[in-house]
Amino acid sequence: MKALTLFLLIFISVSIVSAQPIVVIVRHAEKATNGGNDPDLSSAGQARANELARILKDSGITAIFTTEFKRTQETAAPTATSAHLTPTVVAAKDTAALVAKLHQLNGNALVVGHDDTIPNIVKALGINSSISIPGTDYSELLIVILGDKPELFRLHYPDDAGI
């Protein structure tokens, strides 16, 4: 976990020096099995959301974007509280609106999406390689460094129990 935090801090430092914004993209954390189409996070998901906030604590996040679904909002909530930010809700399928907002930022952002929306977001940010997020994977942490030639870095982060 210390290695992941160090890795993030290095990339955030590079971003600050080069004035290139960084977009951190994660899939929402584990969801409860009940709750229909809009479930809350499970206890494992809450633990993962708390760990995300801990990892991003000193990352210079100045904006947070979620979708209209509770699971993305609950994943972002601990980071928003820690950073004293109010997340912006963007419709899950409105990739163009989200990317437009990201390109207007003068800072780093956290985007909490879904396994089926993240590949489109990454592509719209200028990353040419295609990615997929397995429906059972909640640990992907993608870092996109914006600029003339955006760069993508793929990491994984555990919940606080280390899963």
Region roles according to the model:
Residues Q20-N106, T117-S132, D137-I163:
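Active-site-proximal alpha-helix that buttresses catalytic centers in soluble enzyme cores
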Residues H114:
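Conserved alpha/beta-hydrolase "nucleophile elbow" surrounding the catalytic nucleophile
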Residues M1-Q20:
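Bacterial Sec-dependent N-terminal signal peptides
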